[in-house]
UniProtKB/Swiss-Prot annotation:
Main location: cytoplasm
Keyword Magnesium among UniProt keywords: yes
Organism: Achlya klebsiana
Protein's name in the database: Tubulin beta chain
GO cellular component terms given for this protein: cytoplasm; microtubule
Length: 444
Protein backbone atom coordinates (compact mmCIF):
# COMPACT_ATOMS: atom_id res chain seq x y z
CA UNK A 1 0.00 0.00 0.00
CA UNK A 2 1.20 3.54 -0.65
CA UNK A 3 2.10 4.83 2.80
CA UNK A 4 2.72 8.37 3.96
CA UNK A 5 4.80 9.22 7.00
CA UNK A 6 3.54 12.27 8.85
CA UNK A 7 5.92 14.50 10.78
CA UNK A 8 4.91 17.42 12.97
CA UNK A 9 7.45 19.89 14.30
CA UNK A 10 7.34 22.81 16.71
CA UNK A 11 4.40 24.21 18.60
CA UNK A 12 2.24 25.15 15.64
CA UNK A 13 3.00 21.95 13.72
CA UNK A 14 2.18 19.77 16.69
CA UNK A 15 -1.11 21.49 17.38
CA UNK A 16 -2.24 21.29 13.77
CA UNK A 17 -0.94 17.73 13.53
CA UNK A 18 -2.73 16.58 16.66
CA UNK A 19 -5.98 18.04 15.33
CA UNK A 20 -5.41 16.41 11.93
CA UNK A 21 -5.13 12.99 13.57
CA UNK A 22 -8.35 13.62 15.49
CA UNK A 23 -10.15 14.43 12.26
CA UNK A 24 -8.90 11.51 10.19
CA UNK A 25 -9.17 9.01 13.05
CA UNK A 26 -12.79 10.05 13.29
CA UNK A 27 -13.25 9.58 9.53
CA UNK A 28 -11.69 6.13 9.62
CA UNK A 29 -13.60 5.02 12.69
CA UNK A 30 -10.50 4.71 14.85
CA UNK A 31 -11.13 5.57 18.52
CA UNK A 32 -8.58 7.24 20.86
CA UNK A 33 -7.27 3.84 21.98
CA UNK A 34 -6.55 2.82 18.41
CA UNK A 35 -9.31 0.25 17.97
CA UNK A 36 -11.63 0.33 14.98
CA UNK A 37 -15.33 1.06 15.49
CA UNK A 38 -16.32 2.01 11.98
CA UNK A 39 -19.31 1.10 9.86
CA UNK A 40 -17.93 0.87 6.33
CA UNK A 41 -15.33 -1.25 4.56
CA UNK A 42 -14.17 1.84 2.72
CA UNK A 43 -12.78 3.17 6.00
CA UNK A 44 -10.38 0.24 6.19
CA UNK A 45 -9.60 -0.21 2.52
CA UNK A 46 -6.70 2.25 2.47
CA UNK A 47 -6.26 2.91 6.16
CA UNK A 48 -2.66 1.68 5.86
CA UNK A 49 -1.69 4.89 4.13
CA UNK A 50 -1.64 6.68 7.48
CA UNK A 51 -1.88 3.91 10.07
CA UNK A 52 0.21 0.95 11.02
CA UNK A 53 -1.83 -2.00 12.18
CA UNK A 54 -0.55 -4.19 15.00
CA UNK A 55 -2.69 -6.76 16.84
CA UNK A 56 -5.94 -5.07 15.93
CA UNK A 57 -4.93 -1.56 17.00
CA UNK A 58 -4.18 1.20 14.55
CA UNK A 59 -1.20 3.40 15.26
CA UNK A 60 -0.59 6.59 13.27
CA UNK A 61 2.56 6.74 11.17
CA UNK A 62 3.30 10.01 12.93
CA UNK A 63 6.50 11.47 14.30
CA UNK A 64 6.24 14.33 16.77
CA UNK A 65 9.25 16.55 17.32
CA UNK A 66 9.90 19.72 19.27
CA UNK A 67 12.80 21.37 21.06
CA UNK A 68 10.83 21.76 24.28
CA UNK A 69 8.50 19.31 26.02
CA UNK A 70 5.53 21.67 26.56
CA UNK A 71 3.45 21.23 23.43
CA UNK A 72 4.03 17.50 23.31
CA UNK A 73 2.80 17.09 26.85
CA UNK A 74 -0.42 18.79 25.85
CA UNK A 75 -0.72 16.58 22.75
CA UNK A 76 -0.17 13.54 24.91
CA UNK A 77 -2.80 14.73 27.36
CA UNK A 78 -5.21 15.60 24.52
CA UNK A 79 -8.13 13.48 23.32
CA UNK A 80 -6.07 11.31 20.96
CA UNK A 81 -2.78 11.51 22.86
CA UNK A 82 -2.72 7.79 23.64
CA UNK A 83 -3.06 6.92 19.96
CA UNK A 84 0.51 7.85 19.06
CA UNK A 85 3.42 5.53 19.48
CA UNK A 86 5.33 6.62 22.61
CA UNK A 87 8.76 6.13 20.97
CA UNK A 88 7.77 8.58 18.26
CA UNK A 89 7.79 11.60 20.55
CA UNK A 90 11.23 13.17 20.11
CA UNK A 91 11.90 16.33 22.08
CA UNK A 92 14.66 18.45 23.55
CA UNK A 93 14.53 20.55 26.70
CA UNK A 94 15.96 23.89 25.67
CA UNK A 95 13.54 25.30 23.10
CA UNK A 96 14.56 27.25 20.02
CA UNK A 97 13.21 30.56 21.28
CA UNK A 98 11.86 31.59 17.87
CA UNK A 99 15.39 31.50 16.55
CA UNK A 100 15.78 29.79 13.17
CA UNK A 101 19.52 29.33 13.70
CA UNK A 102 18.94 27.46 16.95
CA UNK A 103 16.52 25.11 15.20
CA UNK A 104 18.64 24.62 12.10
CA UNK A 105 22.23 24.74 13.34
CA UNK A 106 22.60 24.27 17.07
CA UNK A 107 19.82 22.86 19.24
CA UNK A 108 17.97 21.24 16.34
CA UNK A 109 21.12 19.73 14.87
CA UNK A 110 21.77 17.93 18.15
CA UNK A 111 18.32 16.37 18.16
CA UNK A 112 18.05 15.66 14.44
CA UNK A 113 19.70 12.25 14.52
CA UNK A 114 17.21 10.87 17.01
CA UNK A 115 14.39 12.18 14.80
CA UNK A 116 15.96 10.55 11.74
CA UNK A 117 16.18 7.22 13.57
CA UNK A 118 12.44 7.32 14.16
CA UNK A 119 11.85 8.39 10.55
CA UNK A 120 13.89 5.42 9.31
CA UNK A 121 12.02 3.05 11.56
CA UNK A 122 8.66 4.31 10.27
CA UNK A 123 9.85 4.22 6.66
CA UNK A 124 11.08 0.64 7.05
CA UNK A 125 7.71 -0.54 8.31
CA UNK A 126 6.10 0.65 5.04
CA UNK A 127 5.58 -1.67 2.07
CA UNK A 128 5.90 1.09 -0.45
CA UNK A 129 6.50 4.52 1.00
CA UNK A 130 5.17 7.27 -1.26
CA UNK A 131 6.42 10.22 0.73
CA UNK A 132 6.40 12.43 3.77
CA UNK A 133 4.09 15.17 4.92
CA UNK A 134 5.22 17.76 7.42
CA UNK A 135 3.17 20.27 9.40
CA UNK A 136 5.12 23.24 10.72
CA UNK A 137 5.13 27.01 10.85
CA UNK A 138 7.68 29.22 9.12
CA UNK A 139 7.69 32.02 11.67
CA UNK A 140 9.04 30.26 14.77
CA UNK A 141 12.32 28.54 15.50
CA UNK A 142 11.69 24.80 15.71
CA UNK A 143 9.12 24.22 12.97
CA UNK A 144 10.97 26.48 10.57
CA UNK A 145 14.63 25.88 11.45
CA UNK A 146 14.57 22.27 12.54
CA UNK A 147 11.72 21.47 10.16
CA UNK A 148 13.73 22.57 7.13
CA UNK A 149 16.82 20.79 8.48
CA UNK A 150 14.82 17.58 8.70
CA UNK A 151 13.43 18.11 5.20
CA UNK A 152 16.92 18.44 3.75
CA UNK A 153 18.15 15.36 5.64
CA UNK A 154 15.18 13.29 4.46
CA UNK A 155 15.81 14.62 0.96
CA UNK A 156 19.35 13.20 1.08
CA UNK A 157 18.20 9.84 2.32
CA UNK A 158 15.00 9.42 0.29
CA UNK A 159 15.63 11.52 -2.82
CA UNK A 160 12.87 9.89 -4.87
CA UNK A 161 10.05 10.26 -2.33
CA UNK A 162 7.60 13.13 -2.40
CA UNK A 163 8.02 15.77 0.29
CA UNK A 164 4.83 17.65 1.00
CA UNK A 165 4.65 20.39 3.64
CA UNK A 166 1.78 22.24 5.26
CA UNK A 167 3.48 25.47 6.17
CA UNK A 168 1.88 28.18 8.25
CA UNK A 169 3.30 31.36 6.78
CA UNK A 170 3.58 34.72 8.56
CA UNK A 171 0.52 36.91 8.26
CA UNK A 172 0.55 40.55 7.23
CA UNK A 173 -1.17 41.92 10.35
CA UNK A 174 -1.16 39.10 12.89
CA UNK A 175 2.44 38.63 13.92
CA UNK A 176 3.52 36.31 16.71
CA UNK A 177 7.17 37.26 16.79
CA UNK A 178 9.26 40.18 15.61
CA UNK A 179 11.81 38.01 13.83
CA UNK A 180 9.17 36.19 11.75
CA UNK A 181 10.40 37.72 8.44
CA UNK A 182 13.91 36.35 9.07
CA UNK A 183 12.74 32.88 10.01
CA UNK A 184 10.28 32.70 7.12
CA UNK A 185 12.75 33.90 4.50
CA UNK A 186 15.41 31.44 5.65
CA UNK A 187 12.79 28.67 5.56
CA UNK A 188 11.44 29.52 2.11
CA UNK A 189 15.03 29.48 0.87
CA UNK A 190 15.15 25.82 1.99
CA UNK A 191 11.64 24.88 0.86
CA UNK A 192 12.23 26.12 -2.69
CA UNK A 193 15.10 23.67 -3.02
CA UNK A 194 14.03 20.69 -0.92
CA UNK A 195 10.25 20.37 -0.82
CA UNK A 196 8.04 19.08 -3.63
CA UNK A 197 4.73 20.62 -2.60
CA UNK A 198 4.20 23.40 -0.10
CA UNK A 199 0.64 24.16 1.01
CA UNK A 200 0.69 27.74 2.27
CA UNK A 201 -1.61 28.54 5.15
CA UNK A 202 -1.67 31.68 7.15
CA UNK A 203 -3.27 32.80 10.36
CA UNK A 204 -4.63 36.06 9.09
CA UNK A 205 -6.56 34.49 6.24
CA UNK A 206 -7.88 31.95 8.73
CA UNK A 207 -8.89 34.72 11.16
CA UNK A 208 -10.70 36.48 8.31
CA UNK A 209 -12.63 33.33 7.50
CA UNK A 210 -13.60 33.02 11.17
CA UNK A 211 -14.73 36.65 11.44
CA UNK A 212 -16.37 37.20 8.08
CA UNK A 213 -17.76 33.87 7.05
CA UNK A 214 -18.27 32.01 10.28
CA UNK A 215 -19.17 35.14 12.29
CA UNK A 216 -17.08 34.08 15.29
CA UNK A 217 -16.42 37.10 17.49
CA UNK A 218 -13.22 35.90 19.16
CA UNK A 219 -11.76 32.95 17.28
CA UNK A 220 -9.17 30.82 19.08
CA UNK A 221 -6.30 28.82 17.62
CA UNK A 222 -8.62 25.84 18.02
CA UNK A 223 -10.98 27.37 15.46
CA UNK A 224 -8.13 28.12 13.07
CA UNK A 225 -6.84 24.58 13.38
CA UNK A 226 -10.33 23.28 12.69
CA UNK A 227 -10.25 25.05 9.32
CA UNK A 228 -6.74 23.88 8.49
CA UNK A 229 -7.68 20.30 9.31
CA UNK A 230 -10.81 20.44 7.21
CA UNK A 231 -8.58 21.33 4.27
CA UNK A 232 -5.86 18.80 5.14
CA UNK A 233 -8.49 16.11 5.48
CA UNK A 234 -9.84 17.09 2.06
CA UNK A 235 -6.44 17.03 0.39
CA UNK A 236 -5.59 13.66 1.88
CA UNK A 237 -9.00 12.15 1.12
CA UNK A 238 -7.79 10.93 -2.21
CA UNK A 239 -4.95 9.09 -0.58
CA UNK A 240 -7.10 7.60 2.19
CA UNK A 241 -10.20 6.56 0.25
CA UNK A 242 -10.57 5.07 -3.21
CA UNK A 243 -10.37 7.78 -5.89
CA UNK A 244 -8.68 8.73 -9.15
CA UNK A 245 -6.00 11.19 -7.99
CA UNK A 246 -4.75 8.67 -5.50
CA UNK A 247 -1.12 9.54 -4.91
CA UNK A 248 0.82 12.61 -3.86
CA UNK A 249 2.93 12.20 -6.96
CA UNK A 250 -0.07 12.48 -9.29
CA UNK A 251 -1.04 15.61 -7.44
CA UNK A 252 2.44 17.05 -7.91
CA UNK A 253 2.58 16.12 -11.58
CA UNK A 254 -0.72 17.89 -12.20
CA UNK A 255 0.08 21.00 -10.20
CA UNK A 256 3.73 21.86 -10.76
CA UNK A 257 4.57 23.25 -14.22
CA UNK A 258 8.04 24.45 -13.16
CA UNK A 259 10.03 22.86 -10.36
CA UNK A 260 10.50 25.96 -8.22
CA UNK A 261 6.89 27.06 -8.40
CA UNK A 262 5.41 24.62 -5.92
CA UNK A 263 3.74 26.90 -3.40
CA UNK A 264 0.00 26.31 -3.36
CA UNK A 265 -3.01 28.15 -2.05
CA UNK A 266 -5.68 26.10 -0.36
CA UNK A 267 -9.42 26.67 -0.25
CA UNK A 268 -12.26 24.74 1.30
CA UNK A 269 -16.04 24.84 0.91
CA UNK A 270 -18.51 24.87 2.59
CA UNK A 271 -16.86 26.70 5.48
CA UNK A 272 -18.33 25.64 8.81
CA UNK A 273 -17.38 26.47 12.37
CA UNK A 274 -16.48 23.84 14.93
CA UNK A 275 -19.42 21.76 16.10
CA UNK A 276 -21.93 23.38 13.76
CA UNK A 277 -23.66 21.18 11.23
CA UNK A 278 -24.61 22.10 7.72
CA UNK A 279 -28.36 22.64 7.50
CA UNK A 280 -28.80 22.71 3.77
CA UNK A 281 -26.99 20.63 1.25
CA UNK A 282 -25.03 22.66 -1.26
CA UNK A 283 -25.08 21.92 -4.96
CA UNK A 284 -22.02 21.26 -7.09
CA UNK A 285 -22.20 24.70 -8.78
CA UNK A 286 -22.37 26.41 -5.38
CA UNK A 287 -19.40 24.46 -4.07
CA UNK A 288 -17.42 25.26 -7.20
CA UNK A 289 -18.33 28.92 -6.92
CA UNK A 290 -17.32 29.01 -3.26
CA UNK A 291 -14.01 27.23 -3.54
CA UNK A 292 -12.70 29.67 -6.13
CA UNK A 293 -13.81 32.61 -4.02
CA UNK A 294 -10.96 34.69 -2.63
CA UNK A 295 -12.69 34.72 0.77
CA UNK A 296 -12.25 30.95 1.01
CA UNK A 297 -8.49 30.98 0.54
CA UNK A 298 -6.51 30.02 3.61
CA UNK A 299 -3.57 32.15 2.62
CA UNK A 300 -3.42 35.93 2.56
CA UNK A 301 -2.93 36.38 -1.16
CA UNK A 302 -5.76 37.33 -3.46
CA UNK A 303 -6.06 34.98 -6.45
CA UNK A 304 -7.72 37.81 -8.40
CA UNK A 305 -4.39 39.62 -8.42
CA UNK A 306 -2.68 36.81 -10.30
CA UNK A 307 -3.45 33.93 -12.63
CA UNK A 308 -3.76 30.25 -11.96
CA UNK A 309 -1.07 28.12 -13.55
CA UNK A 310 -2.88 24.97 -12.42
CA UNK A 311 -5.47 23.88 -9.89
CA UNK A 312 -6.90 20.70 -8.42
CA UNK A 313 -10.32 20.26 -6.85
CA UNK A 314 -11.30 17.35 -4.68
CA UNK A 315 -15.03 16.90 -4.29
CA UNK A 316 -16.40 14.71 -1.53
CA UNK A 317 -19.89 13.26 -1.24
CA UNK A 318 -22.44 11.73 -3.56
CA UNK A 319 -22.58 13.70 -6.78
CA UNK A 320 -22.34 13.09 -10.48
CA UNK A 321 -18.83 13.19 -11.88
CA UNK A 322 -20.24 14.54 -15.11
CA UNK A 323 -21.67 17.56 -13.31
CA UNK A 324 -18.32 18.21 -11.63
CA UNK A 325 -16.52 18.13 -14.98
CA UNK A 326 -19.07 20.49 -16.51
CA UNK A 327 -18.66 22.93 -13.63
CA UNK A 328 -14.88 22.84 -14.00
CA UNK A 329 -15.11 23.66 -17.70
CA UNK A 330 -17.60 26.34 -16.91
CA UNK A 331 -15.25 28.00 -14.42
CA UNK A 332 -12.40 27.99 -16.92
CA UNK A 333 -14.52 29.38 -19.73
CA UNK A 334 -16.16 32.13 -17.71
CA UNK A 335 -13.02 33.30 -15.94
CA UNK A 336 -10.50 32.54 -18.64
CA UNK A 337 -8.49 35.68 -17.83
CA UNK A 338 -7.61 34.19 -14.44
CA UNK A 339 -6.03 31.09 -15.97
CA UNK A 340 -2.89 31.12 -18.06
CA UNK A 341 -3.79 30.23 -21.63
CA UNK A 342 -0.59 28.36 -22.35
CA UNK A 343 -1.70 25.46 -20.15
CA UNK A 344 -4.97 24.21 -21.63
CA UNK A 345 -7.49 22.57 -19.26
CA UNK A 346 -5.40 23.29 -16.22
CA UNK A 347 -7.91 22.19 -13.59
CA UNK A 348 -7.82 18.62 -12.37
CA UNK A 349 -10.98 17.47 -10.62
CA UNK A 350 -11.63 14.30 -8.73
CA UNK A 351 -14.51 12.90 -6.73
CA UNK A 352 -14.60 10.73 -3.61
CA UNK A 353 -17.93 9.30 -2.44
CA UNK A 354 -17.30 9.65 1.27
CA UNK A 355 -18.15 13.10 2.66
CA UNK A 356 -16.47 14.48 5.79
CA UNK A 357 -18.21 14.11 9.17
CA UNK A 358 -21.36 16.20 9.40
CA UNK A 359 -21.48 17.38 5.76
CA UNK A 360 -23.31 15.98 2.73
CA UNK A 361 -20.79 17.35 0.29
CA UNK A 362 -17.62 19.33 0.46
CA UNK A 363 -14.79 20.35 -1.78
CA UNK A 364 -11.13 21.18 -1.26
CA UNK A 365 -9.21 23.34 -3.65
CA UNK A 366 -5.46 23.50 -4.27
CA UNK A 367 -4.35 26.25 -6.59
CA UNK A 368 -0.96 27.09 -8.00
CA UNK A 369 -1.56 30.78 -8.51
CA UNK A 370 0.97 33.46 -9.37
CA UNK A 371 -0.74 35.63 -6.73
CA UNK A 372 1.11 33.73 -4.03
CA UNK A 373 3.98 36.10 -4.80
CA UNK A 374 2.11 38.72 -2.74
CA UNK A 375 2.87 36.73 0.36
CA UNK A 376 6.56 36.37 -0.47
CA UNK A 377 6.77 40.05 -1.40
CA UNK A 378 5.30 41.06 1.92
CA UNK A 379 7.72 38.94 3.91
CA UNK A 380 10.60 40.09 1.76
CA UNK A 381 9.83 43.78 2.40
CA UNK A 382 9.72 43.20 6.15
CA UNK A 383 12.92 41.19 5.91
CA UNK A 384 14.73 43.92 3.99
CA UNK A 385 13.58 46.63 6.39
CA UNK A 386 15.12 44.78 9.35
CA UNK A 387 18.15 43.37 7.56
CA UNK A 388 19.19 46.77 6.24
CA UNK A 389 19.68 47.88 9.85
CA UNK A 390 21.02 44.44 10.84
CA UNK A 391 18.36 44.34 13.55
CA UNK A 392 18.27 41.20 15.70
CA UNK A 393 21.06 39.68 13.61
CA UNK A 394 23.29 38.98 16.61
CA UNK A 395 20.88 36.25 17.75
CA UNK A 396 21.57 34.40 14.51
CA UNK A 397 25.26 35.10 14.06
CA UNK A 398 25.74 34.10 17.70
CA UNK A 399 24.61 30.60 16.73
CA UNK A 400 27.27 30.50 14.02
CA UNK A 401 25.32 31.79 11.04
CA UNK A 402 26.86 34.02 8.43
CA UNK A 403 25.31 37.18 7.01
CA UNK A 404 25.87 35.75 3.55
CA UNK A 405 23.22 33.20 4.24
CA UNK A 406 20.68 35.94 4.86
CA UNK A 407 21.62 37.67 1.63
CA UNK A 408 21.30 34.42 -0.32
CA UNK A 409 17.93 33.63 1.20
CA UNK A 410 16.71 37.12 0.40
CA UNK A 411 17.77 36.95 -3.24
CA UNK A 412 16.34 33.45 -3.65
CA UNK A 413 12.99 34.69 -2.40
CA UNK A 414 13.10 37.71 -4.71
CA UNK A 415 13.93 35.43 -7.63
CA UNK A 416 10.91 33.35 -6.77
CA UNK A 417 8.69 36.44 -6.84
CA UNK A 418 10.00 37.47 -10.24
CA UNK A 419 9.55 33.96 -11.63
CA UNK A 420 5.90 34.02 -10.62
CA UNK A 421 5.56 37.46 -12.19
CA UNK A 422 7.21 36.29 -15.41
CA UNK A 423 4.72 33.45 -15.87
CA UNK A 424 1.82 35.68 -14.89
CA UNK A 425 2.66 38.02 -17.77
CA UNK A 426 3.48 35.26 -20.24
CA UNK A 427 1.14 34.66 -23.16
CA UNK A 428 0.88 31.68 -25.47
CA UNK A 429 2.32 33.60 -28.44
CA UNK A 430 5.68 34.71 -27.10
CA UNK A 431 6.61 31.23 -25.93
CA UNK A 432 9.60 31.06 -28.31
CA UNK A 433 11.35 33.99 -26.65
CA UNK A 434 10.96 32.38 -23.27
CA UNK A 435 12.63 29.17 -24.23
CA UNK A 436 15.75 31.01 -25.28
CA UNK A 437 15.87 32.88 -21.97
CA UNK A 438 15.41 29.64 -20.11
CA UNK A 439 18.26 28.03 -22.00
CA UNK A 440 20.49 31.00 -21.28
CA UNK A 441 19.71 30.64 -17.57
CA UNK A 442 20.45 26.94 -17.70
CA UNK A 443 23.82 27.59 -19.32
CA UNK A 444 24.76 30.21 -16.78
Amino acid sequence: MRELVHIQGGQCGNQIGAKFWEVISDEHGVDPTGSYHGDSDLQLERINVYYNEATGTYVPRAILMDLEPGTMDSVRAGPYGQLFRPDNFVFGQTGAGNNWAKGHYTEGAELIDSVLDVVRKEAESCDCLQGFQITHSLGGGTGSGMGTLLISKIREEYPDRIMCTYSVCPSPKVSDTVVEPYNATLSVHQLVENADEVMCLDNEALYDICFRTLKLTNPTYGDLNHLVCAAMSGITTLLRFPGQLNSVLKLAVNLIPFPRLHFFMIGFAPLTSRGSQQYRALTVPELTQQQFDAKNMMCAADPRHGRYLTAACMFRGRMSTKEVDEQMLNVQNKNSSYFVEWIPNNIKASVCDIPPKGLKMSTTFIGNSTAIQEMFKRVSEQFTAMFRRKAFLHWYTGEGMDEMEFTEAESNMNDLVSEYQQYQDATAEEEGEFDEDEEMDEMM
